[in-house]
Swiss-Prot record:
GO terms for cellular component: apical plasma membrane; cytosol; microvillus; microvillus membrane; nuclear speck. It comes from the Eukaryota. This is Receptor-type tyrosine-protein phosphatase H. Changing Y945S: Reduces tyrosine phosphorylation. Abolishes tyrosine phosphorylation and interaction with GRB2 and FYN. Residues 1-27 form the signal peptide. The modification Phosphotyrosine is found at Y945, Y953. Disruption phenotype: Viable and fertile. No significant effect on body weight or nutrient absorption. Morphology of intestinal epithelium cells appears to be normal. Double knockouts with APC heterozygotes, a model for intestinal tumorigenesis, show reduced adenoma growth. Double knockouts with IL10, a model of inflammatory bowel disease, show significantly increased colonic inflammation in the presence of commensal bacteria and reduced survival rates. Homodimer; disulfide-linked. Interacts with LCK. Interacts (phosphorylated form) with GRB2 (via SH2 domain). Interacts (phosphorylated form) with FYN (via SH2 domain). Interacts (via extracellular domain) with CEACAM20 (via extracellular domain); the interaction dephosphorylates CEACAM20. PROSITE patterns: FN3 (PS50853), TYR_PHOSPHATASE_1 (PS00383), TYR_PHOSPHATASE_2 (PS50056), TYR_PHOSPHATASE_PTP (PS50055). Expressed strongly in the intestinal tract, with particularly high levels in the duodenum and jejunum (at protein level). Also expressed at low level in the testis (at protein level). Not detected in other tissues tested (at protein level). Residues 28-604 are extracellular. SUPFAM superfamilies: (Phosphotyrosine protein) phosphatases II, Fibronectin type III.
Length: 971
């Protein structure tokens, strides 16, 4: 029978297997195992049945043998989400058509399967830090080899939030949060700190913190932490930090005085001293702490309290890491005693007393007193009292006695005086001690010799001492001596005693003074149109009490505060030359300056003014005649004489309307008469400070100067002549002579002075009655902030808090902060906008409403200083508003009102208050309106000199009324 795969020449009832040849296997059952075949090879099987030598037809299935498994399966690497495997191919004849399958399974969890035709694969998508069983098998033609299996793990995730918990000089403590992964079992954390080019220290732990010790002090380290699980490591988390430096060595006090302690030390014992900063801190228990730093190994901590105990610490910083402190206790030196003096002395002792030092604490003080004789004996005593007797001294000797203070072994500086014990057998004292003469720098003394039998071998000692200051001592064998080297204008106590054979008599003493120094006249300027001069001189060295000023035959005495400020001498003749001297006076001793020649101005200006005044007289006379004729035509009856040019006093409220109507007749003739009577009020008062050379630039208008007696003084600034001056005056009110302050609108150079005045007076209220610019001319500097950005003026900071604007006024809430005193002052500025330049408001109503609002605010803020009111010059609009407020309150309180009397009173405190007749009339109209009576329209006018090189008349009649003695009689 023919058989597939060739003729094998064998015919039996059996199963035939063909493999490039033939193999025959007999089987009596229904299955058979064929071995010794090649793996992963294709075979053709023929199967038939034989019985009794007869065979069935063959059945021919085709099949393949399974491949062999892979060899040498191994892990090539892993990270936190994958495992990389590799292997060698199976040991078989053919490797064609092989597919490798890889599967990694986590117990009870995730399984990931991959296949490849290579001999390596990466299984990803795994969980970090997890154990996996990984298997690899081979597939060919749908048949699979056996599995090769190994166990491995993914790398853990890195730690989170690695940080330094602390460090000292040999260790760094690290902490972290565990990795973010499903399982934290079986984790080991490794920490390693490495110094560049040097030491490395490694530690491991199962906790989330570790201390790496054995490090070098004051060194920079890179510290890394990683996680291990099953021998697999995470990536590193790394930070840079440093160990603390070692502490300083041998900390010691090098010295101290009453306000500081000087410390020194040796640098720390460590490999590197680069980049070290040393910090020193001295703390007083329950009180002050002062801290300083340096890169040196010594420092002085100052700003301490005298005679106080401090704990002083020094530590080292490097890269923001600090060593431990080295600490010692020490005390600042006490302040010296005050007012050391001799209470008494006898032959063998000197009793001293003093006042305790000026310092916070007087506890634990010991006072030491020592009296020493030159080249000889020294005696020292101590006490806790403020007086002591130093005994055991030799009689009749001069001693230098010193007293100092000790606290905690630290000593103050010495206070010293010279005195002597009483001699046992010495010369009698000198007689008739007297001053023979003195000059700026010396005092000449003379005396009669002592009353005794022998005058041989006598030495006279003279000593002049200034209280709390200089002492000069001289000796001579004569009965006179000049003690020089003294200060001019100073009081001295001068003593003379006798020495014989080293033994001293008692002292004879007198009080005298040196002559003051003469001044140097710096300028003499003509003023008042040639009728006066302004004389200025420099302050002399030394002391002085007053100055005698002489210009020609004019003589006056001025107090000592006027040096450097200038004095005006009046009643001189124009176009003349005068000899001027200034004599310094101290204790009835005088020193006259070198004379200078002063020249008054030419009288040409005055002559022109006189001609102008005469012409004005003529014009006014013609005007008076015209008005009188007009009045006679309009009013047949003659006006009673007691109504012409009368000076009205207080007027009853019910009569005020009649008073106004009467004055309004004949074009306000009555008001004109009243106002003329006010023209010269207040003139002739002293304005020396305002006229001083250094203050001239601070005045906006030359003819509006505050009187000396009523001006608002500022606290003077050190070494700034004229810094106490501002053009401002205290003004009377209803209840007080200083109820208001009237001032000019600030100039650019006086804004700081203006805010100083507000602060010093503690005023809560500013009233501004002008606009900064009017009719194209600057009337006031813009002295408050424009917005939220504060303005700085010296020590004062001005802030705008809020602003409320209405049709006729604006109210600003301001805050003043004193940067040195750290104090705040709140205030409001009431800015009236509707007062026209060179005029008066069109109606009383807005001003009355403004005044009512202002008065309500002032009644609420009674704890501060006086309200400060200004316009441009601080006289016209300012005077009108002050008068209106006071007179309306007078009406409310008394039922009376006296405009004339109050304006007169204001002009006694500041010139030109209620500056124009129109303002005077408007004042009456406002009062009348407040009594519910109508007010007529007003004619505007305003006047003053501008502070410019050429004087400009803004209102000739008002200025003439103020500066001349002209007074019109009648209308």
């Amino acid at each position: 029978m023919a058989r597939a795969g060739g003729n094998c020449g064998v015919w039996r009832s059996l199963v035939l297997l063909g493999l490039y040849g033939c193999s025959v296997v007999r089987a009596a059952g229904t299955s058979v195992t064929v071995d010794r075949h090649a793996p992963a090879s294709s075979y053709e099987f023929s199967m038939w049945v034989e019985k009794d030598g007869v065979s069935s037809s063959p059945q021919i299935p085709v099949t393949t043998a399974a491949p062999n498994p892979v060899r040498n399966l191994r892990v090539e690497g892993q990270n936190n989400i994958s495992i990389s495997l590799s292997w060698e191919p199976p040991d078989q004849s053919s490797l064609q058509g092989l597919t490798y399958w890889t599967q990694c399974s986590r117990h009870g969890g995730q399984t990931e399967t991959r296949n490849t035709t290579d001999t390596s694969v990466t299984v990803d998508g795994l969980d970090p830090g997890s154990s996996y069983e990984c298997s690899v098998w081979v597939e060919k033609d749908g048949l699979y080899s056996k599995n090769e299996t190994l166990n491995t793990s993914t790398a853990p995730n890195p730690v989170r939030n690695l940080r330094v918990e602390g460090q000292n000089n040999i260790s760094i403590s690290l902490s972290w949060e565990p990795p973010d992964q499903p399982s934290l079992q079986g984790l080991t954390y490794w920490a390693q700190c490495s110094r560049h080019g040097g030491q490395t220290e490694t530690r491991n732990t199962a906790d989330t913190s570790v201390t790496v010790d054995g490090l070098d002090p004051g060194s920079s380290y890179e510290c890394s932490v990683w996680v291990e699980k099953d021998g697999v490591y995470s990536t590193n988390e790394t930070l840079n930090t440093s160990t603390a430096p070692n502490p300083v060595r041998n900390l010691r006090v090098e010295g101290q005085n009453n306000i500081s302690i000087s410390l020194s030390w040796e640098p720390p014992d460590q490999p590197s001293l680069q980049g070290l900063t040393y910090w020193a801190q001295c703390s007083r228990h329950g009180g002050q702490t002062e801290t300083r730093n340096t890169t040196d190994t010594s420092i002085t901590v100052d700003g301490l309290d005298p005679g106080s105990s401090y704990e002083c610490s020094v530590w080292v910083e490097k890269d923001g890491v600090y060593s431990t402190n080295e600490t010692l206790s020490n005390t600042t030196a006490p302040n010296p005693v005050r007012n050391l003096r001799v209470k008494s002395q006898n032959n063998f002792s000197i009793s001293l007393s003093w006042e305790p030092p000026d310092q916070p604490s007087l506890q634990g003080l010991i006072y030491w007193a020592q009296c020493s004789r030159h080249g000889g004996q020294t005696e020292t005593r101590n006490t806790t009292d403020t007086s002591v007797t130093v005994d055991g001294l030799d009689p009749g000797f001069l001693y230098k006695c010193s007293v100092w203070v000790e606290k905690d072994g630290v000593y103050s500086t010495n206070e010293t005086l010279n005195t002597s014990t009483v001699p046992i057998s010495a010369s009698n004292p000198v007689r008739n001690l007297r001053v023979e003469g003195q000059n700026n720098f010396s005092i000449s003394l003379s005396w009669e010799p002592p009353d005794q039998s022998s005058l041989q071998g006598l030495t006279y000692w003279a000593q002049c001492s200034r209280h709390g200051g200089q002492t000069e001592t001289r000796n001579t064998a004569d009965t006179s001596v000049t003690v020089d080297g003294l200060d001019p204008g100073s009081s001295y106590e001068c003593s003379v005693w006798v020495e014989k054979d080293g033994v001293y008599s008692t002292n004879e003493t007198l009080n005298t003074s040196t002559v003051p120094a003469a001044v140097n006249i710096t300028s003499c300027i003509s003023t008042s149109g040639g009728y006066g001069v302004l004389l200025t001189w420099s302050c002399p060295s030394g002391g002085y009490e007053s100055f005698e000023v002489k210009v020609g035959r004019k003589w006056r005495s001025e107090n000592g505060s006027l040096c450097g400020k200038g004095v005006t001498v009046s009643d001189l003749e124009p176009a003349q030359s005068y000899t001027a001297t200034v004599t310094t006076v101290f204790k009835d001793l005088k020193a006259q300056s070198l004379s200078t020649t002063c020249h008054t101005e030419s009288a040409a200006i005055i002559a022109g003014a006189i001609v102008g005044i005469l012409l004005l007289f003529i014009l006014v006379g013609l005007l008076i005649v015209f008005l009188k004729r007009r009045r006679k035509k309009r009013q047949p009856k003659e006006v009673p004489k007691d109504l012409v040019c009368s000076c009205p006093g207080d007027i009853l409220a019910k009569d005020f309307a009649d008073h106004v109507r009467e004055n309004e007749k004949d074009s306000n003739c009555g008001f004109a008469e009243e106002y003329q009577q006010l023209a010269l009020e207040g003139q002739g008062q002293s304005q020396i400070t305002a006229s001083a050379l250094e203050n001239r630039s601070k005045n906006r208008y030359r003819n509006v100067l505050p009187y000396d007696w009523s001006r608002v003084p500022l606290q003077p600034l050190q070494e700034e002549p004229g810094s106490d001056y501002i053009n401002a005056s205290f003004m009377p009110g209803l209840w007080s002579p200083k109820e208001f302050i009237a001032t000019q609108g600030p100039l650019p150079n006086t804004v700081g002075d203006f805010w100083r005045m507000v602060w010093e007076q503690q005023s809560h209220t500013l009233v501004m009655l002008t606009n900064c610019m009017e009719s194209g001319r600057v009337k006031c500097e813009h002295y408050w902030p424009l917005d939220a950005q504060p303005c700085i003026h010296g020590q004062l900071q001005v802030m705008l808090i809020s602003e409320e604007a209405s049709e006729n006024w604006t109210v600003r809430h301001l805050q003043l902060f004193h940067m040195k005193e750290q104090q705040t002052l709140s205030l409001r500025q009431f800015h009236y906008l509707a007062w026209p330049d060179h005029g008066v408001p069109y109606s009383p109503d807005p001003l009355l409403a403004f005044r009512k609002m202002l008065r309500q605010w002032m009644d609420q803020t009674t704890d501060g200083g006086p309200p400060i009111v200004h316009c441009s010059a601080g006289v016209g609009r300012t005077g009108t508003l002050i008068a209106l407020d006071v007179l309306l309150r007078q009406l409310e309180c008394e039922g009376l009102v006296g405009p004339f009397s109050f304006v007169k009173k204001m002009r006694e405190s500041r010139p030109l208050m209620v500056q124009t007749e129109a303002q005077y009339v408007f004042l009456h109209q406002c009062i009348l309106k407040s009594l519910q009576k109508p007010a007529p329209a007003l004619v505007p006018e305003e006047a003053m000199y501008e502070n410019v090189a050429s004087l400009v008349y803004e209102n000739a009649s008002a200025i003439m009324a103020h500066e001349s003695e002209f007074s019109a009689s009648g209308c």
